[in-house]
Amino acid sequence: SLEGVMVGISPWHLIDQDQINLFADATLDHQWIHTDHRKATDEGPYNSTIAHGYLTLSLIPYLWKQIAEVRNVNMEINYGIENLKFGLPVKVNSKVSLQATIKSVNNLRGTVKVIIEAKLLIEGESKPAYTGDVIFLYHFK
């Protein structure tokens, strides 16, 4: 059984202002806390801009692929996230890493449902950016 197995921790991924700005453009979310360095530094609570929470969530599939290789997959579906809790904000120029532990694996008539306990680590911080149970559906060839 794979339940409870810590699959691994991804390599560190730098979140810079360019990535934050591109995400702001893609999602039409240009709040100053994300995009205005001067205002965020002078008036914001974090002394810098911060990444959008949804930007950090959208990195899960990329970071997961750095940890686990699932072979013979025809299609992988990001099915959802349960019990999501945001912790610390991710400041610009921070490095993040995904820690993944298998919570469950179920075969649903040919589709495999995998739930991982995901924790987004921030380099130099003791608390994560978030934790949650990420659900992937795999359709195999």
Show where each model-derived region lies.
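Short alpha-helix capping/helix-loop boundary micro-motifs
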Residues: 81-86
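Short, low-complexity, polar/charged sequence segments that are solvent-exposed and flexible
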Residues: 31-34, 42, 78-79, 117-121, ...
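Hot-dog-fold acyl-thioester-processing enzymes
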Residues: 1-78
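HotDog/MaoC-like acyl-thioester-processing domains
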Residues: 1-2, 89-141
